[in-house]
Regions:
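Cytosolic-side membrane-insertion boundary helix
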Residues: 159-172
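Structured cytosolic domains appended to multi-pass membrane proteins
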Residues: 1-161
């Protein structure tokens, strides 16, 4: 097992040096990025990303995208955000902050420049009103970075939908 691990490390080093020489975006080590927010359920997403980083024996980074709306956040939301940042630090994440109003672009650009292999985000339970609605954060990220693994964790308990079955009547 030790020799297999050493062989894998050697292959990683060779691949990494080849990646640097060819200026490629492919990385061999796992680097998990979690997106921070003031959502009440963001703690669940942070814990999930931490478990992934531990399972993959990878680097764990937590990213907050500060937009121009940040100063207008309520004190309750700011406190929740601070609590989520503190939780990520406790779980071993390196905290990073980027600035910009296009959140999806900021996340994917940070991921590309930092060698992130997996992004963990929360899924809002907000429903779209119609087909031509603005794309969600996740949809934008998928377009901007098709080569990254993006894990979407539901913000709240998933709603189970019942499949309607046709009622059969028995004729007597």
């Amino acid at each position: 097992e030790i020799s297999l691990r050493r062989c894998a490390d050697r292959v990683n080093k060779l691949t990494e040096s080849a990646r640097i020489k060819s200026n490629s975006d492919y990385f061999t080590d796992e680097h998990i990025l979690v997106c921070l927010s003031s959502s009440p359920t963001n703690a669940k997403i942070i814990r999930t990303a931490s478990r992934m980083a531990n399972a993959f024996k990878g680097t764990f980074t937590a990213l907050f995208v500060e937009t121009s709306d940040f100063p207008n956040m309520s004190e309750e939301d700011k406190k929740r955000l601070r609590d989520n940042i503190h939780l990520a630090e406790q779980l071993g994440a390196t905290i990073e902050t980027v600035y910009g109003d296009d959140v999806a672009f900021q996340i994917t650009e940070f991921a590309r420049l930092s060698g992130v292999s997996k992004i963990v985000v929360g899924r809002s339970t907000a429903k779209r009103k119609h087909i031509f609605a603005k794309p969600t954060l996740t949809e934008k990220m998928l377009v901007l970075s098709p080569n990254l693994d993006i894990y979407v964790i539901p913000d709240k308990e998933t709603v189970s939908y019942k499949i309607k079955t046709k009622q059969h009547y028995k004729w007597k």
